[in-house]
């Protein structure tokens, strides 16, 4: 691979000791993306065919709970960063190791708005 070739990736991120709450925020954040056919096709190609078929079925019957269930833990772990600081930092390093030269962390918070999420992210990497 060429060193001049740029690979960047936006990664939804939620830092919280309460992993379940952080995962819930990530599922809510990704609902809109999961509803779009272009993202569904991308994730199918990336190996998440069952998840995206389940998403499509949930969307077809407008079942929000089924949609949340369709976004599996495996899928969520692979496409976002969430949980305690150490896990988020470890996940960030994994993205770098995979060849993503510029991971773009897009923060959300379980307990506040965008500014709170940015503060949490800055503290995590201070």
State what each model feature region is.
Residues 1-126:
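Active-site-adjacent structural elements that line small-molecule/cofactor binding pockets in enzymes
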């Amino acid at each position: 691979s060429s060193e001049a070739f740029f690979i960047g990736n936006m990664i939804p991120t939620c830092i919280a000791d309460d992993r379940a709450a952080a995962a819930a925020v990530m599922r809510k954040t990704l609902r809109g993306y999961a509803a779009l056919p272009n993202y569904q096709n991308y994730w199918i190609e990336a190996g998440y065919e069952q998840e995206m078929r389940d998403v499509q079925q949930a969307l077809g019957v407008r079942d929000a709970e089924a949609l949340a269930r369709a976004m599996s833990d495996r899928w969520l772990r692979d496409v976002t960063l969430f949980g305690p600081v150490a896990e988020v930092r470890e996940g960030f390093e994994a993205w770098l190791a995979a060849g993503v030269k510029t991971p773009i962390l897009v923060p959300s918070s379980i307990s506040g708005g965008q500014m709170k999420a940015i503060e949490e992210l800055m503290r995590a990497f201070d």
